[in-house]
Amino acid sequence: MEKRRVVITGLGTVNPLGNNVSASWDAAMAGKCGIGPITQFDASEFKCKLAGEVKNFDPETVVDKKEARKMARFTLLALAAAAEAIADSGLDTEAEARQIGVILSSGIGGLPTIEEQHTRGEEKGMEKVSPYFVPMSIANMAAAQIAIRFGLKGMCTCPVTACAGGTNAVGDAFHRIRDGYEPVMVCGGAESGISPLGIGGFTSMKALSTASDPDAASLPFDARRGGFVMGEGSGVLVLEELEHAKARGAHIYAEVVGYGANCDAYHFTAPAPGGAGAIDCMKLALADGQVTPEAIDHINAHGTGTHMNDSCETAAIHAVFGAHAGDIAVVSTKSMTGHLLGGAGGVEAVFTALALRDQFAPPTIHYEQPDPECDLDYVPNTGRSMKMEYALSNSLGFGGHNACLVFRKWEG
């Protein structure tokens, strides 16, 4: 069966840099920092006091007040991003409802809701928790609510693969279209886990930065790095079969050409030595897209700001790209947004598509002290206009989940 070409026709995002695509991308290009003091709970007694929060988000711009009370924050963020992406695409979702699917990831779903309802149960009895507790909390509900809101009756799933989930969602959607199952997919990721239990759990495993200065907390590839900064938000893309998009005169941002996914099968949190799983994953994505390593100009790296991730990912890039690795603009936008966990891959796919459109690599901010183990071109502190034909986006998750996407500049 002939494989169909897949393009991006709609983008939407809500993240620590902005509540829509335009504001977020302007901030990313300018190297703004979206990290600040935690405001969603009193973190004064916590070692970690910083996060990448979404600012001034009004759920009633998405749903009415009554409906908002039935949804967890990660679902509301996903709905906002999806609404922007679908509007941006110009799709007639009612006319094509049965042909449009949804794949949207969340790593931990409604964790803050679980905490809130457990407290309520302890105080009033467990049978007094909200009747909406379970549907609010489960990770698939953001995907489901997008499908319900827009009447989308194609395949609807939720990859729960930790920090690789958003990229798995986009990649799985790409393959669904390429292989002829649906002509259109709404895909990406969403997360909102900035809560006492979320921050406490990641702090306990020594994964989070405990820096007090927002400009010295999320430090991907820098020798000073000491952990990631929790972020929240959602990134959603509309993917579409090329001829379907052309037939309706859709605007095209970029083309998705390759996807790789695999597992380290090594450890539940630590990456495989030398980035072995990431090496294979990037090779799978390049082979899937029939793209040579030398063709890649830009990588939106996983780049969390943990010691092991950044050194292993750098080693993996060296192994895959050889002498060409030093010519690639390798960027961690997590330096600006923090780590959105299951939402990261969606937001970073949005940024990668825009980088290709605008021929501009956003910076890795806060970069001051080079690490001998991290010796690539990280576009330090100031973004760069550059010619780019192909770009790659990496996501590496707890459990050894690896996912990689390859995008191509749209020449139409």
Over which residues does each language-model region extend?
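Conserved beta-ketoacyl condensing-enzyme motif
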Residues: 8, 24-25, 29-161, 190-199, ...
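Glycine-/small-residue-rich "gating" segment that lines the acyl/pantetheine channel
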Residues: 123-130, 171, 175, 191-247, ...
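Flexible, low-complexity linker/loop segments at domain and module junctions
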Residues: 1-8, 96-97, 289-295, 323-326, ...
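Condensing-enzyme catalytic core mediating Claisen C-C bond formation in acyl metabolism
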Residues: 5-9, 33-36, 213-289, 297-298, ...
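Active-site-proximal alpha-helical scaffold in enzymes
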Residues: 78-91, 139-143, 147-191, 229-250, ...
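ACP-dependent fatty acid/polyketide chain-elongation machinery
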Residues: 1-67, 243-253, 350-365, 408-412
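Short glycine/threonine-rich loop-to-helix capping motif typified by GTGT followed
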Residues: 266-275, 304-321, 340-347
